[in-house]
UniProtKB/Swiss-Prot annotation:
Pathway(s) it belongs to: Cofactor biosynthesis; riboflavin biosynthesis; riboflavin from 2-hydroxy-3-oxobutyl phosphate and 5-amino-6-(D-ribitylamino)uracil: step 1/2
EC id: 2.5.1.78
Protein name: 6,7-dimethyl-8-ribityllumazine synthase
Native source organism of the sequence: Corynebacterium glutamicum (strain ATCC 13032 / DSM 20300 / JCM 1318 / BCRC 11384 / CCUG 27702 / LMG 3730 / NBRC 12168 / NCIMB 10025 / NRRL B-2784 / 534)
Family according to the record: Belongs to the DMRL synthase family.
Superkingdom as given in the UniProt entry: Bacteria
Main function: Catalyzes the formation of 6,7-dimethyl-8-ribityllumazine by condensation of 5-amino-6-(D-ribitylamino)uracil with 3,4-dihydroxy-2-butanone 4-phosphate. This is the penultimate step in the biosynthesis of riboflavin.
Listed PANTHER family: 6,7-DIMETHYL-8-RIBITYLLUMAZINE SYNTHASE, 6,7-DIMETHYL-8-RIBITYLLUMAZINE SYNTHASE DMRL SYNTHASE LUMAZINE SYNTHASE
């Protein structure tokens, strides 16, 4: 099962943090669920959450990069389901590399909630819907907020 080995993670107190959520519109039902759960988790943690939508996963990095300049953290959400061509690999690699580069270049946490699955059923199982085994939208938000808090602590003590 996919949850095996995951650390126990609690919703952090993110009061005062500003986080953006950028969500792709492809695979709308899945992405809308990821988006709702990420936004709900951010607000429940006390963060100020702003919301943005883009067409697809390839458009995520450029918008995330712009938002990383003005936010404590950014969450990128999308869903790429494998098809019959190599396009899946190109999209997944480009998005993952882009989001990682942005996080490193800006020192801003980027929660990567872009699902990369072989089937739509796998995406549904990870999107936090009824019967899901995981909730990658909320998990990406918690990871981004937690990392922003760690960076804030480091900057305050190393300052």
């Amino acid at each position: 099962m996919a949850k095996e080995g995951l650390p126990a993670v609690e919703l952090p107190d993110a009061s005062g943090l500003k986080v953006a959520v950028v969500t792709a519109r492809w695979n709308a039902e899945i992405c809308d669920r990821l988006h709702k759960h990420a936004v709900d988790a951010g607000r429940a943690a006390g963060a100020t959450v702003s919301e943005y939508r883009v067409i697809g996963a390839l458009e995520l990095p450029v918008v995330v990069q712009e938002l990383a300049r003005t936010h404590d953290a950014v969450v990128a959400l999308g869903c790429v389901v494998r098809g019959g061509t190599p396009h899946f690999d190109y999209v997944c690699d480009s998005v993952t590399e882009g989001l990682t580069r942005i996080a490193l270049d800006t020192s801003t946490p980027i929660g990567n909630g872009v699902l990369t699955t072989n089937t739509e059923e796998q995406a549904v199982e990870r999107s936090g819907g009824e019967g899901s085994v995981e909730d990658k939208g909320a998990e990406a938000m918690v990871a981004a907020l937690d990392t922003a808090l760690v960076l804030s602590q480091i900057r305050a003590t190393e300052g």
